[in-house]
Amino acid sequence: MHHTVHVKDLRFSYPDGHAALNGVTLSIEPCEKVALVGPNGAGKSTLMLHLNGILHGQGEVKICGWSLENGNLGRVRAAVGLVFQDPDDQLFSPTVFEDVAFGPLHMGVPEAEVRERVAHALEAVGMGAYADRVSHHLSMGEKKRIAIATVLSMEPEILVLDEPSAGLDPRARRGLINLLRALPQTMLISTHDLPLVRELFPRTVVMDQGRIVADGPTQSILNDVPLLEAHGLEKM
């Protein structure tokens, strides 16, 4: 069986010369739930943008056994449900239905199946009654749910979420936690919300300065006060 995510010795520098990834190696198994933590500028978001080919560095990236080369980019992007930190970066259509339908329609899914996928995705995030609403009139918590629905409609193998709890009030945050707990997909999340990590993610990976500096059971990582302090993370 293939790893859902396999990254080996991944290196990437931005045009200004900043080295954002310095030899990252990471594997994630099917159905595994993994949290990615570290200070701002550690390379977490840069790593995530490599998983569906938005960025291309040096090294090896495979999703469900598919390399990002050799014409596989379309199937890789369908397999990786990338949810940005700011849902307004993901929601651009006149209605919620059109936002959630955009991906499958773009991939050539028949219209009848698209409607079924949209209905299923909206129900999965608790937004079944919102299909005709205007996305930009929703609250931040509602927008984040719709953004997740836009990738669920692609029937991804893995959800990759960048700071999903950022900007949420306590009630919306709790609703998000309950939603993430219920989703069956393999999951990789980047976050500063360590209580969320402790509650939902059995494995935690710590990044700093473009490298993985720790990888192990969440309870062990989050109880290691010297490790947290050394890499700009608040002890719990």
List each model region and its residues.
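H-loop/switch region of ABC-family ATPase nucleotide-binding domains
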Residues: 191-192
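Conserved ABC ATPase "signature" region
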Residues: 112-130
